[in-house]
Design a protein with these regions (language model features):
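Ferredoxin-reductase
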Residues: 70-150
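An N-terminal, well-structured beta->alpha segment
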Residues: 1-98, 104-105
Length: 150
């Protein structure tokens, strides 16, 4: 263990919640809510201070990742990006927001709708897409969602 790093400080019950790790191995998942239902004024504050992801965060996340692909020359304008999801977002708001982020970045969203995660990553390879997003929280409770990246 590196002794130059500060020790982790536990959050007391009267402090706002902060998350220690934003992204896991292949994405992010956790509780979701509408931004207007949170006490935050923007999606990053909602994530960092309340630990919740909003539909605006889904758009920002896919947009930022696609911009990174473009900036690193792993993708070119209008390249394909596959996106699919599990059935937990009954309103479709989070799914639509993630698709908006891809399109806003200048890439082409190939929407495959509801498919199992392995099928989406295989389809990405089949169509030679720059990347794929799967909107799922896997085995987490229904009030949660997530974004996996392939």
């Amino acid at each position: 263990m590196n002794s130059d790093l500060p020790a982790a400080k536990p959050v007391s019950s009267n402090e706002s919640m902060t998350i220690e790790r934003i992204q896991g191995t292949d994405g992010i998942r956790g509780p979701v809510c509408r931004l207007e239902d949170s006490s935050s004024s923007n999606p990053l504050d909602a994530l960092l201070n309340e630990g919740v992801m909003t539909e605006e965060f889904f758009e920002l996340y896919t947009y930022a990742y696609c911009q990174e692909l473009l900036g690193a020359d792993f993708a070119s304008a209008h390249d394909l990006v596959v996106i699919g999801w599990d059935p937990r977002d009954l309103s479709g708001r989070f799914n639509e927001a993630a698709v908006r982020g891809i399109r806003k970045a200048g890439l082409t969203a190939v929407v495959v709708d509801i498919l199992p995660t392995p099928a989406i990553s295989l389809y990405q390879l089949h169509v030679r897409a720059a990347c794929a997003f799967v909107l799922t929280a896997s085995h987490n409770p229904a009030g949660q969602n997530g974004i996996k990246i392939f």
